[in-house]
Amino acid sequence: MAEDGRKMSKRRGNVVNPDDVIAEYGADVFRTYEMFMGPFDQAISWNTQGMKGVKKFIDKIIALFDKVDENYQDEAKILTILHQTIKKLTQEIDEFKFNTSIA
């Protein structure tokens, strides 16, 4: 759906060109925004402001890597959390719940 709530159509001229969006925000932001949009089986309106929010989200995640302490010793705890996360993500992706799997 277009930002105005109508179905996207070349005839109406309300189609979002993915190449333009990727040029402005990047492919990772574009893909993540599409996953955040909502349940896979529902029509959701495009929202350019949402792209800006996802860009901030991605930037925060990238900034977290700068704060990683390479001397952290509790590897077992990290591995437990990692395996729990992988299990949850796998289940949600299998159920096409992309929007909740990345949230």
Regions found by a protein language model. Name each.
Residues M1-A103:
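Long, charged, mostly alpha-helical binding arms that flank functional sites
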